[in-house]
Amino acid sequence: MKTIDANIILRFLTNDLPNQADRVASLLRKLEEQSETAFLPDLILADIIWVLEGYYKQPRAQIRDWMTSILSLPGLEFSNKEIALTALDIYVETKIDWSDAFTASQMLACGIIEIFSFDHHFDKIKGITRIEP
């Protein structure tokens, strides 16, 4: 198995370098067919989302749709796809930043319902109670 870097996914999604995007499309077909496997680390997913939102100014719903498709590739391994998919929904629905959406998703998956934080945006997440120390 190999690891996939952020620039691979970004080249495909943005098509800003068509020659590279075509090569990535071939790799993604192999991941779809499971003739190739790859691992996508959590931090690389965060990097992809940060670049798509910050540099490419893509709407959150578009980012969610793209990343849901990528994470659904049978040959692509991710530490916990369900946590990531839930985090993508939280990211879109609450408009909080990705790292906090991912944290909230991990909390909910682990049955943790309280967070020590001064960030009021955690108040938007159903099932989580924010506590200020």
Question: Model regions: which residues?
Answer:
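Acidic, PIN/NYN-like endoribonuclease modules and their adjacent C-terminal/linker elements
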Residues: 1, 104-105, 109-133
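Short, well-structured N-terminal submotif of metal-dependent ribonuclease cores
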Residues: 1-40, 55-62, 68
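Histidine- and aromatic-rich ligand-binding microenvironments
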Residues: 5, 40-41, 96-97, 119, ...
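Structured helix-beta-strand junction loops
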Residues: 34-35, 73, 94, 125
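Active-site neighborhoods of divalent-metal-dependent phosphate/nucleic-acid chemistry enzymes
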Residues: 75-115
